[in-house]
Each structure stands twice: as C-alpha cells, then as structure tokens.
A protein has these predicted regions:
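Immediate post-signal-peptide N-terminus of mature secreted/exported proteins
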Residues: 1-56
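Heptad-repeat alpha-helical rod positions in long coiled-coil/spectrin-like domains
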Residues: 11, 15-18, 22, 54, ...
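Amphipathic, well-ordered alpha-helical segments in soluble domains
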Residues: 16, 20-30, 73, 77, ...
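Short, charged, amphipathic alpha-helical segments
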Residues: 43-50, 94-102, 146-153
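Extended amphipathic alpha-helical interaction segments
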Residues: 66-146
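Long amphipathic all-alpha helical oligomerization modules
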Residues: 116, 120-182
C-alpha cells in the first residue's frame, strides 16, 4: 500500500528538515563566538564550525534523498489511485474518488513546493558557510576574525531565512499529514 509509504516518507522528510534547521541554528553561535577568541582557541572554533558545516552538508544529501522518495511514492500512489478510479463502475463513487484525489494532489503539491523551496535555499547558505570555514582555515589569526565580522550580519540573515523556510516546509508537511489521515 502506497499511502502508508507516502505518509512515512513525508514524516521522515519533515524530521530531516527539522534536524537540518537545528544544525544551522547550532552553527550560528559558533560563528558569533569567533570575535571573542584569540590565538589557539580560534582553531578550536574553526574545527567546530567545520564539523557543523559537514553535518549540514550530509543532512542536505539526506533531505535530497527523502524528497526524491516522497516524489516517487506520491507519483506511484496517484497513478494507482487514477487506475483504480477507472475500474469503478459506480459513477457516484468515481466522482467522489476523483474529487478526493484532486484535493489530495493539491495538498501534496503545496507540500512539495514548500519542501523544494526550503531545500533550494540550503545550497546558498551552505556555500556561504563553506566560504566562511575555508577563509577561517586559511587565515587562522586575529586579522581574519576582524574581517569576518563584516560577513556576520549577512550569514546570520541567510540562516534566519533558511530556518523560516524549513519551518514553513515542516508546517506544510504537518498539514498534509493531518489532512492525509483524515
């Protein structure tokens, strides 16, 4: 049965996005800590930030896979549903089932757009975070800390927008699951 598979994949994609949001939130304080450290402590912050970046990158790959799974299962579910509607001989049942299919497909499309939009915003933030990590790696000194401070506002803003997008995607998944179960 494809219905439980779709529900499970949507739930897993929602959980993955929530975890990803937390990872981005965790990376931000580490960036902010940079201005308060000197010398050897700077390398520790770099290593923590690098780990955060790598975690975020791995999670992005997992989210891509989850979205692909959701898309495939949804396509299979909708194709099966349409095929079964064509097998119905009762016109009233057929009409009702088509309406239900259309509503479910519309809710799924809203969910899918939200997931893809949130995922699309991850790469630019990851790229910026990677730039930051590499710059820090190559300039492990007090001068690097001073020049990175100017980027702080932009990175903080990018992460805030990304977290909001992920939260909207999670809300769309919750709404889809609630309607899907009804």
């Amino acid at each position: 049965e494809k219905r439980p598979l779709l529900r499970d994949q949507v739930e897993q994609a929602r959980e993955d996005q929530a975890e990803r949001s937390e990872e981005f939130k965790d990376a931000l304080p580490r960036i902010k800590e940079l201005t308060g450290f000197q010398g050897g402590e700077l390398e520790n912050v770099y290593l923590q930030l690098k780990d955060d970046y790598e975690d975020c990158e791995r999670r992005a790959a997992v989210i891509d896979e989850r979205i692909d799974n959701v898309e495939q299962i949804a396509a299979d579910l909708f194709a099966e549903w349409e095929s079964e509607i064509d097998q119905m001989t009762n016109p009233s049942f057929r009409t009702s089932s088509r309406q239900s299919l259309a509503r479910t497909r519309d809710r799924y499309n809203r969910l899918h757009r939200a997931m893809v939009q949130a995922r699309g915003r991850m790469d630019p933030v990851l790229s910026r975070l990677n730039d930051y990590v590499l710059y820090l790696k190559h300039n492990l000194n007090a001068q690097a800390v001073g020049s990175l401070g100017t980027e702080m506002g932009r990175i903080e803003s990018d992460i805030a927008v990304l977290v909001r997008d992920i939260e909207r995607s999670i809300e769309a998944a919750d709404a889809f699951l609630q309607d899907f179960e009804a």
